[in-house]
């Protein structure tokens, strides 16, 4: 099978079917696609349980259970008729070479963005967001980050490849403006002086959705936004299949409502990460991720109107 790298793909974690049964296009750069889905089967930057390299395959597989619905509830229209989306398969890299993965992912993203495409990416561990941010910042300039997670990922431990350090590195590289960025669902220790607005899980759960959304919009304003969703933002009751689960998180219903609430933001790139199917039960984590990913596409399609 031809792949992003023009190589034969003998990966044990890739697959030959597209998200939501969407068309597969391994050379999407010259296509007429508006949004391109890329799988990133990488988990070498994990600090807890590994296995998120199998996340893209799990998300795609369970997404077939969502493909039947035409006018999806509650949107009442079919995203596929408004938005041209293709799945370009998984990034191919030398397994064990984190630097090669990072460089190839950034190059792939830069090429897509230069061709006028937008990206929805499936991790893999959360480190994959950093090369994606580098590519998006080259194209759009400094961005705001809207970040759903149980952890802030702003730790300065000096490790180059670590899924807990991206949002320490990204502001230092000038990729994002933390004062215009929001981290949602946090419920672990973090440095309160890093500049981000942190809406921790207790307050997000206790406040109304409209109240939280209004604060996010006020902070972000009209900046270009990169949206990243670590599945461990959800409570383990809704997403047990992840490397570093933390109780006390968001419900899947609240997460969907928050995504719908921020649809008016200028979202220029999106990802969903940290699905580790080995720890899942009845595919509920993969289903949550696939549904959230589909919701991300719907908020883009809604902007186009009829």
From Swiss-Prot:
The keyword Hydrolase applies. Its EC number is 3.5.3.11. Keywords: Hydrolase, Manganese, Metal-binding, Polyamine biosynthesis, Putrescine biosynthesis, Spermidine biosynthesis. It comes from the Bacteria. Coiled coil: none annotated. This is Agmatinase. GO terms for molecular function: agmatinase activity; manganese ion binding. HAMAP family: SpeB. It catalyses: agmatine + H2O = urea + putrescine. Signal peptide: none annotated. The keyword Manganese applies. It is an enzyme of class 3 (hydrolase). Mn(2+) binds at residues 126, 149, 151, 153, 230, 232. Catalyzes the formation of putrescine from agmatine. Disulfide bonds: none annotated. Its cofactor is Mn(2+). Pathway: Amine and polyamine biosynthesis; putrescine biosynthesis via agmatine pathway; putrescine from agmatine: step 1/1.
């Amino acid at each position: 099978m031809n792949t992003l790298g023009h190589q034969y793909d003998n990966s044990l974690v890739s697959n030959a079917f597209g998200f939501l049964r969407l068309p597969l296009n391994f050379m999407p750069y010259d296509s007429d696609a508006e949004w391109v889905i890329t799988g990133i089967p990488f988990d070498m930057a994990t600090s807890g349980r590994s296995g998120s390299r199998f996340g893209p395959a799990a998300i795609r597989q369970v997404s077939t259970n969502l493909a039947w619905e035409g006018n999806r509830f509650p949107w009442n229209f079919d995203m596929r008729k408004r938005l041209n989306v293709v799945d370009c398969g998984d990034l191919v890299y030398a397994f064990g070479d984190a630097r090669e993965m990072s460089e190839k992912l950034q190059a792939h993203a830069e090429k897509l963005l230069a061709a006028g495409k937008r990206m929805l990416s499936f991790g893999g561990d959360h480190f994959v967001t950093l090369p994606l941010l580098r590519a998006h910042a080259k194209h759009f300039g400094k961005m705001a980050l809207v970040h759903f997670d149980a952890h802030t990922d702003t730790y300065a431990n000096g490790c180059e490849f670590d899924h807990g350090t991206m949002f320490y590195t990204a502001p230092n590289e000038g990729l994002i403006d933390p004062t215009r960025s929001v981290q949602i669902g946090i419920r672990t220790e973090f440095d309160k002086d890093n500049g981000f607005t942190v809406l921790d899980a207790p307050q997000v759960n206790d406040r109304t959705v409209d109240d939280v959304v209004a604060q996010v919009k006020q902070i972000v304003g009209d900046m270009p936004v990169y949206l990243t969703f670590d599945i461990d933002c959800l409570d383990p009751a809704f997403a047990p299949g992840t490397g570093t689960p933390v109780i006390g998180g968001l419900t899947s219903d609240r997460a969907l409502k928050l995504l719908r609430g921020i649809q008016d933001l200028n979202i220029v790139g999106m990802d969903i990460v940290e699905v580790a199917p080995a720890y899942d039960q009845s595919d509920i984590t993969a289903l949550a991720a696939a549904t959230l990913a589909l919701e991300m596409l719907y908020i883009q399609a809604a902007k186009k109107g009829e």
